[in-house]
Amino acid sequence: MKIVLLGPPGAGKGTQAKSISNRYSIPHISTGDIFRKNISENTPLGMEARSYMDKGLLVPDEVTINMVKDRLQEEDCLSGYLLDGFPRTVAQAEALNEFLENRNEQLDTALLIDVPSEFILDRMTGRRVCTSCGGSFHIKFNPPTIDGKCNLCGSDIVQRKDDTVETVKERIDVYDKQTQPLIEFYKSKNLLSMVDGTKAIDQVFEDICKLLGEQ
């Protein structure tokens, strides 16, 4: 089973990816992990990527695509895989499509965990973390017993910079602009599947399993 996982920041992709990987015994492949591995091992592609990153530049599609292609040819991918964070653009999706066609393979589905922007804002801006022990809370869904204090150690809990309204809105905006063409691309290929990401974690996973059973 070959799956591309799509969804906005705060949609719970990481949680669902882990569950899918465990249930179907396929590797969860994230572009972040691929980049870190190539860079830490000083592979030719890793060194090329680092040369761009050190200058504060975006790594070209060609480098990212070749890293992903190399990863998909490893032995643990023979029975399938779950791609998380790739493709990010239509050009990358087309490159993946071509790679699969050349191997007489095909993608089973592009799975979109759909969550409205207002819900993401509520979910992400309400997160709080303890300054001492790292305990996590949510002012709406998992509030501390004493306002502003950690249940575990009594230290202050704070909002991370990544979780401010301005930052979250910016991330959602970037996602929308980047991913909408990708969603249309997979729709046109009849490969797009959608689940409602506002449901409880277990219910979202149950819906995903039902969808994957239809592939």
From Swiss-Prot:
The EC number(s) this enzyme carries = 2.7.4.3
Residue positions annotated to bind ATP are 10-15, 127, 136-137, 199
Q: What GO annotations for molecular function exist for this entry?
A: adenylate kinase activity; ATP binding; zinc ion binding
Entry binding sites for AMP: 31, 36, 57-59, 85-88, 92, 160, 171
Q: Which reaction does it catalyse?
A: AMP + ATP = 2 ADP
Binding site residues for Zn(2+): 130, 133, 150, 153
Entry's localization field: Cytoplasm
Pathway assigned in UniProt: Purine metabolism; AMP biosynthesis via salvage pathway; AMP from ADP: step 1/1
Q: Supply one GO CC term from the record.
A: cytoplasm
BP terms from Gene Ontology: AMP salvage
Q: A Pfam family this protein belongs to?
A: ADK_lid
Q: InterPro entries given for it?
A: Adenyl_kin_sub, Adenylat/UMP-CMP_kin, Adenylat_kinase_CS, Adenylate_kinase_lid-dom, P-loop_NTPase
Provide the residue span(s) of the region labelled LID: 126-163
Quaternary structure and interacting proteins, as annotated: Monomer.
**UniProt function note:** Catalyzes the reversible transfer of the terminal phosphate group between ATP and AMP. Plays an important role in cellular energy homeostasis and in adenine nucleotide metabolism.
Family that this chain belongs to: Belongs to the adenylate kinase family.
Query: NCBIfam families attached here?
Result: adk (TIGR01351), PRK00279.1-2 (NF001380), PRK00279.1-3 (NF001381), PRK14527.1 (NF011100)
UniProt domain comment: Consists of three domains, a large central CORE domain and two small peripheral domains, NMPbind and LID, which undergo movements during catalysis. The LID domain closes over the site of phosphoryl transfer upon ATP binding. Assembling and dissambling the active center during each catalytic cycle provides an effective means to prevent ATP hydrolysis. Some bacteria have evolved a zinc-coordinating structure that stabilizes the LID domain.
Q: What is this protein called?
A: Adenylate kinase
Q: Which gene encodes it?
A: adk
